[in-house]
Design a protein with these regions (language model features):
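Active-site-proximal, acidic helix/loop segment immediately C-terminal to a metal-coordinating Asp/Glu
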Residues: 27-49, 131, 135-186
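Catalytic core of PPM/PP2C metal-dependent serine/threonine phosphatase domains
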Residues: 33-103, 177, 181-192, 196-197
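PP2C/PPM-type serine/threonine phosphatase catalytic core
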Residues: 89-127, 131-133, 138-139, 146, ...
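Short hydrophobic/glycine-rich mini-motifs in sensory/regulatory modules
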Residues: 14-20, 133-136, 190
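DG-centered beta-turn motif at the end of beta-strands
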Residues: 24, 95, 140-143, 191
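Cytosolic ligand/metal-binding cores
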Residues: 18, 22-23, 30
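Single conserved hydrophobic/aromatic residue that forms the stacking wall/gate
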Residues: 1-7, 11
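A short acidic-Thr-Gly-centered motif at the start of a beta-strand
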Residues: 11-15, 79-83, 128-130
């Protein structure tokens, strides 16, 4: 079973694969929201049309490049989870690090790359991991890290994630966001999205 909570989109396919997408438009306000919505909607339609994940990501990037005259750039964090094997593949395009929580242990997944829409030839950076029953994947947008008032922001966020005791994905995502907001006085300075996905054996 997969449990997800946050402002990302989850697509379930008939072959037992789950796709989770978190996108953050560059800038802020309505324009940034429109860019990230375009990315998520386009990827969903391409997957529903039968395109592979790799083809969908390339077509999405090309579409963003075409509209780049309007400076349309977005980060894309795209996770694919095989619900039979627990295999996780992350494709990052300019996206913030993601984290795997296994009990009290937290590991980081990061791949530096440009956001979607910059170069028609660019490709997402891929990484593979295997999730065990009880593990959580935590995906965030840049804003979650940027406003932590410490030198080692990534380490601080890892400590926050490790400190969450709930095994409910929704509670976990909210607790992480609430803790980060303590550093901003409760005000979201930028898009601050947290998505938590838990994996459990039936």
């Amino acid at each position: 079973r997969l449990r997800s909570r946050g402002l990302g989109d989850v697509y379930k396919r008939q072959d037992g694969m789950y796709h989770v997408c978190v996108s953050d438009g560059m800038g802020s306000g309505k324009q940034a929201q429109a860019e990230s919505t375009l990315v998520v909607d386009l990827l969903e339609k391409l997957l529903e049309a039968g395109f592979s994940r790799e083809s969908a990501l390339k077509l999405m990037n090309s579409a963003m490049v075409i509209s780049a005259g309007e400076e349309s750039y977005s980060t894309v964090d795209f996770a694919t989870i095989d619900m039979y094997t627990g295999e996780l593949e992350l494709a990052k395009t300019g996206a913030a690090p993601s984290f795997i929580k296994s009990g009290k242990k937290v590991s980081v997944i990061e791949n530096e790359s440009l956001p979607a829409g910059v170069d028609v030839w660019q490709e997402s950076k891929h990484s593979k991991n295997t999730l065990q029953s009880g593990d959580f994947l935590v995906m965030v947008t840049d804003g979650v890290l940027e406003y932590l008032h410490v030198k080692d922001r990534q380490g601080k966020l890892m400590d926050i994630i490790a400190g969450v005791k709930s095994d409910n994905a929704g509670v976990m995502a909210q607790e992480i966001l609430d803790r980060v907001l303590l550093d901003t006085g409760g005000y979201a300075m930028d898009d601050m999205t947290v998505v938590a996905i838990g994996i459990w054996e039936k």
